[in-house]
Amino acid sequence: MISTRVMDIKLREAAEGLGEDSTGKKKSKFKTFKKFFGKKKRKESPSSTGSSTWKQSQTRNEVIAIESGPVGYDSEDELEESRGTLGSRALSHDSIFIPESGQDATRPVRVFSQENVCDRIKALQLKIQCNVKMGPPPPPGGLPAKRGEDAGMSSEDDGLPRSPPEMSLLHDVGPGTTIKVSVVSPDHVSDSTVSARISDNSLAPVADFSYPAESSSCLDNSAAKHKLQVKPRNQRSSKMRRLSSRAQSESLSDLTCTPEEEENEEKPLLEVSPEERPSSGQQDVAPDRGPEPGPPAPLPPPGGARARRARLQHSSALTASVEEGGVPGEDPSSRPATPELAEPESAPTLRVEPPSPPEGPPNPGPDGGKQDGEAPPAGPCAPATDKAEEVVCAPEDVASPFPTAIPEGDTTPPETDPAATSEAPSARDGPERSVPKEAEPTPPVLPDEEKGPPGPAPEPEREAETEPERGAGTEPERIGTEPSTAPAPSPPAPKSCLKHRPAAASEGPAASPPLAAAESPPVEPGPGSLDAEAAAPERPKAERAEAPPAGAERAAPERKAERGGAELRGAKKFSVSSCRARPRPGVSRPLERASGRLPLARSGPVWRSEAALDDLQGLPEPQHAKPGPRKLAERGPQDSGDRAASPAGPRKSPQEAAAAPGTREPCPAAQEPAPSEDRNPFPVKLRSTSLSLKYRDGASQEVKGVKRYSAEVRLERSLTVLPKEEKCPLGTAPALRGTRAPSDQGKGKARPPEPLSSKPPLPRKPLLQSFTLPHQPAPPDAGPGEREPRKEPRTAEKRPLRRGAEKSLPPAATGPGADGQPAPPWITVTRQKRRGTLDQPPNQEDKPGARTLKSEPGKQAKVPERGQEPVKQADFVRSKSFLITPVKPAVDRKQGAKLNFKEGLQRGISLSHQNLAQSAVMMEKELHQLKRASYASTDQPSWMELARKKSQAWSDMPQIIK
């Protein structure tokens, strides 16, 4: 506006200096306008006043055009040289876009005007009449008014097809021009210029205000183009690409987000929009995850950013309104009524969270505990939000431990908002949960997230309610542990909470994909899981940069189920906003999401396992050794139990009880892996995601087309499939879901995306189970006695495996579980490669059951030993395990069809026992033997063996490089 006003002043000065000198300059500079200038001189002699007045009106219009966008003046001198120059150039630009037919039509009118102009009075009268006509009815009178103006104006306007700009400008300037003419008619150019200045002063702002709407025609040349050229347009393009699939879900979610809520929170949206814009800027820098087109990178620069901001603002407004209306009040009716909306909104809230913190503090009231727990890791983010949250948390966090964490949490308002969002979803899940939240101010915080995943289904919500009640005891313990740990390592304590939440979130996503079939249920679990995941990124600040992508990836599949692109954006913005220092992780997330959001969850396990292998050995041990041993050990069992129960809850309430204890054991290891996986998943994620996303998407489709077990065999091609199937024959199919979440937790929350991706499609579930089979049996061990025989041996295995997972989670977490395959990443990659070729192997899978047993003991032995081995050895074992893993897939494939599910379970149990006893001895011998047997006896062609070796080498390469 200021620049446009300055231009207006300059134009006015030019209008004042509209002398013959300016016309002479025009002649020298613009030969094309010489004729028009000559006509101008002639017209000026008969009616200099009229021409000047019309020129001024043109200048006004031109000024408006200039304001709308750069008209292309080479210098201010040209502007000052003459309004004619300005008009000519502005019209010249318009002429480029506007046919000259209008000019021709106006010329005859101009001729009449010239004749009439012979008398200045007549000319002015005609002009005034035209202006009056144009002013009141600008659209209809615009053309005639333009003609009248052209008649009044010098031939410059005649030459240029200025009618279109005048149309819109006249609409804006119509009354002003009339005033100008009235003032100018008696006076000369100086008076007209003065009047023009006055009218410009009044009109320039008017034109500016009207420009957004009216400038569309005029601004198409300049301002509109610039706007389109700005980042938003690129963001829109990339976003359109990413959101092509999201658009529908987002539009639905945005539609679900009532405009009323958006209106109610327009102010918060305004607040959010600035922060979202920075976050979107970061995202834009990321080019949306570049891939996604960047976490935010994929987000189209301007258009996409604007659309995204608008969507995010809508979603954030909805989330803010939902949280404000729902969380503080915890209106179960509103949230349950709009669980999908509320949770998609909650996801957006995560996005908006930096701006939404003002909203969040009222919302977090019940969420304060969670937010405080989550916030400490994100400490640097938002002290302001945490202040409000502290106020809110004080009542909510009856348990003071989180208040202690609150100071740290003060730095992490974004994450606090995520917590609020997650709690809002949980509150949305039902007032019952919110009641446990309040009753157990801090303990329910984790349960809330846990509840959030189970909450997707109303029944799971009830189960989750029971879970919070169950976990109430454990969570109070958590609280006790957290408070004690929170004062000194309060960020680690929230980290552990975040870890647990990511586990719950991953489980929630895992549950949400299956629930995705149920449509609304996945939406609800998604937000909780998203929040948990969002909290997960917060766990360690160091991890944040890496963790947010993992959380975002986890959230991406869930959000796909919920909102699709909208929630993904929320995750992006949440990651960016929660950790504005995490623009990179946010970027990587969108990249992964862009590649394939659900596939990201699918591939997420792969790259997470790889990242877990790398990070767990390197980072997770020290970091988790601090918060992990204390809080993971304390909270790990409890939180994992609650989480396992909550993910299982949506699927199977009995298994919630079973999974809760089982998961508790694996939870510490799982918790440690999760951050590491979140940390390094980006490069690995991107690599594995492109392949694994396609591969897993195809696998899920195949599973849909093919029987679940056959698809599982193909997907896993390892005994893990058999254990999965074994669990299913035991009649624990729902338990499998529940145990999967626990096993995923025990395995390492590095795989939470896997549960998410694996749960929606049946085959994916087997994959998760197969990878986590040793841990999964253990959750059953702690839980119901259905699988006690399996559970007992596998529990023993799980514990050493968990230890190994803590030290070298890649083998344990990546391993099918009992097999302890450390190479799920390469296995997934090789599976992707093999799937095309190994769709044949299902026959081979039937062949060597004994080999599978051998490979399982050997690999299981590997896992315990790895747990014992130092991190370096774990890394070395990784390469070996990756080399060995092909054996299991081949053997498992062969066995998959032959072995019955029960037989497979029995073998798995026996193998687990054998593995425990033989792990040390079998390690290297069986590794080599299994390698040989798997390559030689898999009945696979040599090219398959080579492919395996190559895939293993490639999978090992990133680790070695790292």
UniProtKB/Swiss-Prot annotation:
<feature type="compositionally biased region" description="Basic residues">
    <location>
        <begin position="224"/>
        <end position="244"/>
    </location>
</feature>
<feature type="modified residue" description="Phosphoserine">
    <location>
        <position position="490"/>
    </location>
</feature>
<feature type="compositionally biased region" description="Basic and acidic residues">
    <location>
        <begin position="844"/>
        <end position="869"/>
    </location>
</feature>
<feature type="compositionally biased region" description="Pro residues">
    <location>
        <begin position="354"/>
        <end position="365"/>
    </location>
</feature>
<feature type="compositionally biased region" description="Basic and acidic residues">
    <location>
        <begin position="266"/>
        <end position="278"/>
    </location>
</feature>
<feature type="compositionally biased region" description="Polar residues">
    <location>
        <begin position="245"/>
        <end position="256"/>
    </location>
</feature>
<feature type="compositionally biased region" description="Pro residues">
    <location>
        <begin position="292"/>
        <end position="303"/>
    </location>
</feature>
<protein>
    <recommendedName>
        <fullName>CRACD-like protein</fullName>
    </recommendedName>
</protein>
<feature type="compositionally biased region" description="Basic and acidic residues">
    <location>
        <begin position="555"/>
        <end position="570"/>
    </location>
</feature>
<feature type="compositionally biased region" description="Basic and acidic residues">
    <location>
        <begin position="631"/>
        <end position="642"/>
    </location>
</feature>
<feature type="region of interest" description="Disordered">
    <location>
        <begin position="212"/>
        <end position="871"/>
    </location>
</feature>
<feature type="compositionally biased region" description="Basic and acidic residues">
    <location>
        <begin position="784"/>
        <end position="806"/>
    </location>
</feature>
<feature type="compositionally biased region" description="Low complexity">
    <location>
        <begin position="503"/>
        <end position="521"/>
    </location>
</feature>
<feature type="compositionally biased region" description="Basic and acidic residues">
    <location>
        <begin position="429"/>
        <end position="440"/>
    </location>
</feature>
<feature type="compositionally biased region" description="Polar residues">
    <location>
        <begin position="46"/>
        <end position="61"/>
    </location>
</feature>
<feature type="region of interest" description="Disordered">
    <location>
        <begin position="131"/>
        <end position="174"/>
    </location>
</feature>
<feature type="compositionally biased region" description="Pro residues">
    <location>
        <begin position="753"/>
        <end position="764"/>
    </location>
</feature>
<keyword id="KW-0597">Phosphoprotein</keyword>
<feature type="compositionally biased region" description="Basic and acidic residues">
    <location>
        <begin position="536"/>
        <end position="546"/>
    </location>
</feature>
<dbReference type="InterPro" id="IPR028030">
    <property type="entry name" value="DUF4592"/>
</dbReference>
<feature type="region of interest" description="Disordered">
    <location>
        <begin position="38"/>
        <end position="102"/>
    </location>
</feature>
<feature type="compositionally biased region" description="Basic and acidic residues">
    <location>
        <begin position="709"/>
        <end position="728"/>
    </location>
</feature>
<dbReference type="Pfam" id="PF15262">
    <property type="entry name" value="DUF4592"/>
</dbReference>
<feature type="compositionally biased region" description="Basic and acidic residues">
    <location>
        <begin position="459"/>
        <end position="480"/>
    </location>
</feature>
<dbReference type="InterPro" id="IPR026713">
    <property type="entry name" value="CRACD-like"/>
</dbReference>
<feature type="modified residue" description="Phosphoserine">
    <location>
        <position position="92"/>
    </location>
</feature>
<feature type="compositionally biased region" description="Low complexity">
    <location>
        <begin position="407"/>
        <end position="425"/>
    </location>
</feature>
